[in-house]
């Protein structure tokens, strides 16, 4: 049985999700700090697949790590990284069973 190819996030998609998330949370300090840092993080799952034997959770983990480590947004970096990781998993048919509030709380370091 063949598996579906992984759908990777685009730069434009991440920007839209970041802005929508920050507005929904009532944040006023958000936006792009460095586009190259976003694109670098978005490339990590592709590299993990090309140069290793990364399954979907491993690709998601490297995406999340890259987004948090790179700190590419003005604000909301951990929340956006957690949200985008969840989105990445969902668009590829994998759902996290934790409540969204628990995911955000865990992802924001609280």
Predicted features and spans:
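FIC/Doc superfamily catalytic core
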Residues: 1-110
